[in-house]
């Protein structure tokens, strides 16, 4: 009887070894030509980010690389549309964007047996800028919606026509406006795109009738000399959710309370199928240290307290 049991155990053991060996063979075949030399804290990788989050992403990378000397993270700052295309083409495996994957995109990855990790890292806001000489610094949501649906005149007498400028035609900023204020319709002819958030700030500073749309991260850290320079070039508009209601600027605190109406969540999305440098960087950004960097940058971190920064 014992001999029979021993033979059964031996058979099960040898079968398990065979199964593991075959599984490893399939994995190695699937990874053929994809030898990975990076680890969560070393090596070289390239991630993608919407230009709206450049200050925060740069700050995160600077601290991460200071902690892990063997790590080098490069960034492609691209329009949101290009980031998701890169993710689907596998030219990018980690991105920072103002939206999650769509159902169609999730299905695409599922069909490829990939299950992306989508992690909320922060909440930021759309900031509206006007020229320093423009007295119209308080707008209602009704007025903002009207501007993007054909009303091209400033309320103040003598201010003339409005010109609206974005960072990029396919950026997260322009998508947010289309989806939330325009019901997906096309931009009016007096709206046009530049190539970056700093270009928007510069344009507004030189054109009295301009209204600029940027990610608030570019003007949210008043400890940063570049931010102070931007804030000297243009004014950040106060926005009221209702007519006759209180107006708020996109301070970190008012993003948290929801009093400032033009807010959105920020996500890191990872398709990296192994524990590489992209995975390590995502873990860092979501850690206490990484979240405190976001806090310091003036947008709302997912997990730590907030304060008011005066523009």
Question: For each predicted feature, which ranges?
Answer:
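Exported/periplasmic ABC-transporter solute-binding proteins
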Residues: 29-69, 73-76, 80-81, 85-88, ...
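Periplasmic N-terminal soluble interaction domains immediately after the signal peptide in Gram-negative
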Residues: 113-117
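Bacterial Sec-dependent N-terminal signal peptides
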Residues: 1-46, 311
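Pocket-flanking alpha-helical
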Residues: 81-112, 222
């Amino acid at each position: 009887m014992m001999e029979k049991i021993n033979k059964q155990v031996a058979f099960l053991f040898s079968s398990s070894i065979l199964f593991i060996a075959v599984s490893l063979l399939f994995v190695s075949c699937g990874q053929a030509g994809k030898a990975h030399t990076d680890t969560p804290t070393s090596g070289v990788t390239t991630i993608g980010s919407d230009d709206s989050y450049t200050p925060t992403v740069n700050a995160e990378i600077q601290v991460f690389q200071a902690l892990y000397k063997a790590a080098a993270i490069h960034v492609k700052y691209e329009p949101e549309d290009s980031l998701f295309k890169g993710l689907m083409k596998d030219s990018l495996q980690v991105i920072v964007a103002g939206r999650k994957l769509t159902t169609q995109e999730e299905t695409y990855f599922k069909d490829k047996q990939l299950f992306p990790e989508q992690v909320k890292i922060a909440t930021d806001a759309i900031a509206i800028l006007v020229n320093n000489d423009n007295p119209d610094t308080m707008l209602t949501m009704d007025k903002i919606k009207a501007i993007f649906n054909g009303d091209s005149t400033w309320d103040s007498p003598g201010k003339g026509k409005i010109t609206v400028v974005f960072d990029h035609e396919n950026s997260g900023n322009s998508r947010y406006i289309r989806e939330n204020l325009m019901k997906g319709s096309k931009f009016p002819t007096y709206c046009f795109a530049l190539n970056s958030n700093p270009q928007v700030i510069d344009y507004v500073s030189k054109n009295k009738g301009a209204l600029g749309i940027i990610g608030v991260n570019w003007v949210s850290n008043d400890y940063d000399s570049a931010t102070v320079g931007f804030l000297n070039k243009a004014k950040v508009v106060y926005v009221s959710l209702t007519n006759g209601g209180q107006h708020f600027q996109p301070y970190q605190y008012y993003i948290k309370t929801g009093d400032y109406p033009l807010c959105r969540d920020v996500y890191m999305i990872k398709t990296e199928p192994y524990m590489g440098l992209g995975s390590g960087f995502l873990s860092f950004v979501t850690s206490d240290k990484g979240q405190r960097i976001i806090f310091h940058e003036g947008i709302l971190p997912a997990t730590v307290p907030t304060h008011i920064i005066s523009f």
